[in-house]
Amino acid sequence: GLLDALLLDNGYLTAVRTAAAGAVAARALSRADSRSVALIGAGEQAALQLQALRLVRPIDNVRVWARDLAKAQAFSVDLARDSGLDVMPCATIDEAMAEVDIAITCTPSRAPLIDSHHLRPGLHITAMGSDAEHKNEISPQALAQVDRYVADRLSQTRILGELHHALAAGVVGDESGFAELGQVLAGQ
């Protein structure tokens, strides 16, 4: 037969699926009482990540950082208006990361944005932007210090993104007891 319909979503379904995966990870791995989040990035994925996160955590405080402060400010104004949340644009990543319960990175950064000094007990980080070999949002040294690293697919993260860079830097071993999200969800 003939084609009845064609869905041209321009990546929207992929973006929503990515945000849903972030929320599933946060539900499984972050503290249930998490109320504050740092969005590192101020694009479509950041907005979708927050929308999905709010379905699984009682978020009421949001900090936003973007390389372009004007973009973080405009994003924050729109987000506060549309959500009713307390949203603060931040000039630095340090300011955004101060005392938040969850951080979500969703940038195309080639250089680490989150470093060891941002880590503290109870912080959950959902890193979404490192989907290519050259991308890296979290420093290898920070990754070496986390209590738990969970990937959607270890076979992919060993060649792309943060784990790839930490392995290449020699700060974590290939058999460091990393888990996949599916294993965590299955109670393994």
Model-identified regions with their sequence ranges:
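Rossmann-fold NAD(P) dinucleotide-binding segment
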Residues: E95, E99-I102, S109-H124
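Adenosine-phosphate binding glycine-rich loop
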Residues: N136-Q188
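Glycine-rich Rossmann-fold phosphate-binding loop(s) that bind the pyrophosphate
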Residues: G41-G43
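Phosphate/diphosphate ligand-binding glycine-rich loop within oxidoreductases
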Residues: G1-S34
